[in-house]
C-alpha cells in the first residue's frame, strides 16, 4: 500500500470517528394500515412508509406536510392509494433541495412534519427532521437558491 493510500484511509477513519453517526432504531409508528419507520430523521436519511392491509374500499392519499413555521404546514408530497387496486406497498421518501420547487436550504426541511391520510379517518402521524446531515451527504444540502 502506498503512503498516499494509507493517508487517505487514515483521513476517512478520522472523519468516521468524528461523525459517530448511528441510525436510530426503527420504531414503526402506526396509524391504521400506515406505518413510518422512525419518529426522527437526519437530513439524507430515507423515510420509509409501509402500507399493509388496506381495505378494498379505502381510497385516498398519503400527504407528507413539511413545516412552514410553528403552526402552518405545506404539502411536500402526496402518494395515492387504492385498496381495490393494491392492498399493500412500500414507499421511500428523501427530502432533497430543489431550486425549481423552492426548497433552497436545510431550513426548508428541519422541524416537525406531519403525515395526513386523506380520504380516511386515521389519525395523523408526526416525525421530526433534525439539522444533522447524514455523513457523506453534506454536499447535497448546500443552499441552492
Which ranges hold each PLM region?
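Extracytoplasmic/secretory-pathway segments with low complexity and glycosylation-like composition
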Residues: 1-145
Amino acid at each position: 500500500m502506498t503512503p498516499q493510500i494509507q493517508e487517505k484511509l487514515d483521513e476517512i477513519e478520522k472523519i468516521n470517528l468524528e461523525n459517530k453517526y448511528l441510525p436510530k432504531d426503527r420504531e414503526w409508528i402506526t396509524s391504521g394500515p400506515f406505518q413510518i419507520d422512525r419518529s426522527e430523521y437526519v437530513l439524507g436519511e430515507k423515510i420509509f412508509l409501509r402500507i399493509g392491509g388496506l381495505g378494498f374500499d379505502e381510497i385516498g392519499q398519503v400527504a407528507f406536510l413539511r413545516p412552514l413555521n410553528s403552526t402552518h404546514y405545506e404539502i411536500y408530497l402526496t402518494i395515492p392509494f387504492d385498496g381495490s387496486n393494491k392492498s399493500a406497498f412500500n414507499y421511500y421518501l428523501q427530502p432533497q433541495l430543489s431550486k425549481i420547487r423552492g426548497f433552497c436550504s436545510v431550513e426548508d426541511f428541519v422541524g416537525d412534519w406531519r403525515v395526513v391520510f386523506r380520504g380516511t379517518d386515521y389519525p395523523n402521524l408526526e416525525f421530526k427532521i433534525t439539522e444533522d446531515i447524514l455523513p457523506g451527504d453534506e454536499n447535497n444540502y448546500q443552499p441552492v437558491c
